[in-house]
């Protein structure tokens, strides 16, 4: 049986329509998308997810459960021994306890244990939420090897965009605006001093694999650079496993604006508008609010266009389905 969708032709809307059809007792259906609109492939055949495991906890897991419930998908949860009485456990249709010897945090980082539960529960896909394993390419690879769909970016995209130097190079290829600086690792103090003079102080030293607010140092003058560079390399080596450092111009009092994007398997990318994340402590966001205010609409549109352009350049996807 073939049903033609008259809804918005994006992966998420199509998936929701197919789930609705299935929930009404119509089986073995094919969703056919007419050529045009947002679809670039002409015809898409989708097998809706029936069971999805959420590899997270707390409010994050509850939000994903709710979205899955709205689509008529069975939710499978995981929880540590310490979380056995937590609210989120009862919100899933099925829940499985993680290994007891892992602790309250490491239990949610146990790739092997989570995959074992996913197989036992016979799930079609795993949604990582955010944090924990959501940006771990090894987890994505483990899902692929188990024949389970990972709802998120591919491991190649994670590896490429998780490295700040690599991601900056991709941004340059995409033709999107970037902060003045260099797109390669600096190997010597002499090279660092030369680049800093070229960019102009103040500058920021950044670890290519930095994250969590660490791996960034502001340098206001040439006298401080040798010491700051050595300390930045040592910190990066200890915290992230390598000492690749690059330089960007330091911008005082900037607005930190993020854009939420949705990208499917076929290169369709849409933005879900912006949010302001400028309120920070130690380079980590404290408060986010949307939409961002005090931004000219022309600038806002440039940000949206740049986000979509970059996603298309790298082949990013975060809305996936079982084809």
Please state what every model-predicted region is.
Residues 13, 19, 29-31:
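Cysteine-centric signal of extracytoplasmic or virion-exposed proteins
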Residues 4-7, 16, 20:
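Short hydrophobic alpha-helical segments enriched in small aliphatic residues
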């Amino acid at each position: 049986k073939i049903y033609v969708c008259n809804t918005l032709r994006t992966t998420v809307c199509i998936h929701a329509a197919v789930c609705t059809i299935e929930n009404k007792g119509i089986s073995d259906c094919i969703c056919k998308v007419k050529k045009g609109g947002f679809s670039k492939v002409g015809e898409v055949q989708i097998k809706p997810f029936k069971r999805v495991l959420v590899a997270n906890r707390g409010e994050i897991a509850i939000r994903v459960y709710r979205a899955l419930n709205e689509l008529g998908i069975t939710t499978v949860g995981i929880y540590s021994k310490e979380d056995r009485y937590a609210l989120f456990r009862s919100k899933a249709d099925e829940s499985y306890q993680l290994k007891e010897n892992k602790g309250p945090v490491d239990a949610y980082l146990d790739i092997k244990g989570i995959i074992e539960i996913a197989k036992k529960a016979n799930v079609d896909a795993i949604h990582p939420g955010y944090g924990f394993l959501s940006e771990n390419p090894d987890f994505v690879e483990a899902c692929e090897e188990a024949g389970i769909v990972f709802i998120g970016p591919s491991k190649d995209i994670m590896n490429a965009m998780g490295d700040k130097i690599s991601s900056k190079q991709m941004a340059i290829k995409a033709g999107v605006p970037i902060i003045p600086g260099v797109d390669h690792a600096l190997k010597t103090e002499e090279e660092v001093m030369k680049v800093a003079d070229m960019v102009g102080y103040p500058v920021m030293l950044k670890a290519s694999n930095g994250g969590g607010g660490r791996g960034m140092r502001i340098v206001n003058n040439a006298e401080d650079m040798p010491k700051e560079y050595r300390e930045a390399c040592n910190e990066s080596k200890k915290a992230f496993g390598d000492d690749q450092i690059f330089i960007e111009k330091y911008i005082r009092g900037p607005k930190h604006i993020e854009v939420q994007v949705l990208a499917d398997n076929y290169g369709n990318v849409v933005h879900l508008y912006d949010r302001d994340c400028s309120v920070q402590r130690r380079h980590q966001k404290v408060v986010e609010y949307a939409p961002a205010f005090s931004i000219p609409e022309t600038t806002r549109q440039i940000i949206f266009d740049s986000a979509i352009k970059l996603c298309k350049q790298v082949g990013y996807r975060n809305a996936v389905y079982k084809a």
